[in-house]
Amino acid sequence: MENQKEKILVVDDEASIRRILETRLTIIGYEVITASNGEEALIIFRKEYPSLVVLDVMMPKLDGYGVCQELRKESDVPIIMLTALGEVCDRITGLEIGADDYVVKPFSPKELEARIRSVLRRADKITTNLGVPNSGIISIGFLKIDTNKRQVYKNNERVRLTGMEFSLLELLVSKAGEPFSRASILQEVWGYTPERHVDTRVVDVHISRLRAKLEDDPSNPDLILTARGTGYLFQRIIEMNKL
């Protein structure tokens, strides 16, 4: 099975949720390790190097937000947050500090499984064809985007992007000057079709994160622009240099 080598760390202080997810994810071919609190999660992460982390928000001592912040200091590992918080602003807090996606409790295990597959697909090192040659370096002013190594440089310094952030940037750059709707971005980058009713603010938060990392003035961007009434577009003219 294609997922056998993928290792997932499940972090939740509820033993029942850990057991359910460990059982379900093991059945569909993942290797699963678990942690019951944030401090344990960081220890296990640094020992096991999982392919993805499923991270509960509400935990004693070090909560999911704190774990996410610590992980982002040292890793681009995909993170899916589990949140029981009702307010939308609470749900997207994890995205703002570096998570790739979130699922609201109570959740369907099948829904979480689908999101895990989608996030892992996009975090894969194999570059999909989005209209930009994967053997080239894209030069846009002070930016260089290596579509083969999935790396970005700003003023010749490496900028750390998560897998989802890179895929979003790659999509926008693939058709520079053409606007993408939030719905189309969700489908192309996250694999979510419109009937799944995913909150489009997932896109907005990731755009904000990209701007913060790539723009000289994130509040007045000149690379990643907002297309009013539509979504977003990448502005600059691209010069393609073959590797």
Curated annotation (Swiss-Prot):
Residue range(s) of DNA binding per entry: 76-94, 135-236
> Which PROSITE patterns does the record match to this protein?
OMPR_PHOB (PS51755), RESPONSE_REGULATORY (PS50110)
Q: Where in the cell does this protein reside?
A: Plastid, Chloroplast
Instruction: Quote the SUPFAM superfamilies the UniProt record gives.
Output: C-terminal effector domain of the bipartite response regulators, CheY-like
Name the Gene3D superfamilies for this protein: 3.40.50.2300, 6.10.250.690, Winged helix-like DNA-binding domain superfamily/Winged helix DNA-binding domain (1.10.10.10)
- The record places domain Response regulatory at 7-120
Gene Ontology MF term list? phosphorelay response regulator activity; transcription cis-regulatory region binding
The chain's disulfide connectivity reads: none
Q: What is its main location?
A: plastid
SMART domains from the UniProt entry = REC (SM00448), Trans_reg_C (SM00862)
Protein function: Probable promoter-specific protein mediating the interaction between DNA and RNA polymerase.
Put simply, this protein is called Probable transcriptional regulator ycf27
Which source organism does the UniProt entry give?
A: Porphyra purpurea (Red seaweed)
